[in-house]
Amino acid sequence: MSFHTFFFNAIDKIYYRRQNCRRETRFEDLDFDIVRDIVYDPSDGATCRLDVCRLRGTGSLPVIFYIHGGGFEAGDKHCRAALARWFAALGYAVVNVNYGPAPRYRFPAQHVQLCAALGWVQGNAAKYGFDLSRVICGGDSAGAYYAAALACIADNGELQSRLGASPCIKFGAMLLNCGVYDMV
């Protein structure tokens, strides 16, 4: 394990309880409908999983497709569970997605996996009450990079054909927190 992977795994372990296990009094009266570990790509079911979080008893909702960070080599969707509940409390259906970390998965595997997750969202919109006309794509750190890349892929036929992916969802907004971008 590289120092980089060790470092990001340590951050997740140190802050997991603080971020996800505290009693959240502001959510006590809310009834969440959370479905965990849904396989979005059966060819790699151990890695390609997502969670759906929303308020129980609500109709069609705008979607936040959220991608965790972790320095490209670490991280997990479960470390963003409290954030997903917070977004759900605001009236969103949250899709909290995992992808394969480097170096085990090499470019462009993560992009292809995340496009497959978007395909799952589109294919399951009726079942989970996703309003596909109102989709926000977001993430933190490496997840913000992947979210920005998905926005480029969704709007570029050449990138879609190079990756063998065809996300049909267009994003109405982006939620990018401390991502890594090459702006030059």
Language-model regions, residue ranges each:
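Catalytic nucleophile-loop/oxyanion-hole region of alpha/beta-hydrolase
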Residues: G75-A84, V95-L132
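N-terminal presequences and immediately downstream first alpha-helices
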Residues: M1-R26, A144-Y145, M174-L175
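Short beta-strand element of the alpha/beta-hydrolase
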Residues: S60-G70
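Catalytic metal-binding/acid-base residues of hydrolase active sites
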Residues: G71, G100, V180
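A fold-wide structural signal in alpha/beta-hydrolase
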Residues: V63, A88-V95
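N-terminal cap/lid segment of alpha/beta-hydrolase-fold proteins
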Residues: D12-G59
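Primarily recognizes the serine-hydrolase "nucleophile elbow" in alpha/beta-hydrolase
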Residues: G119-V184
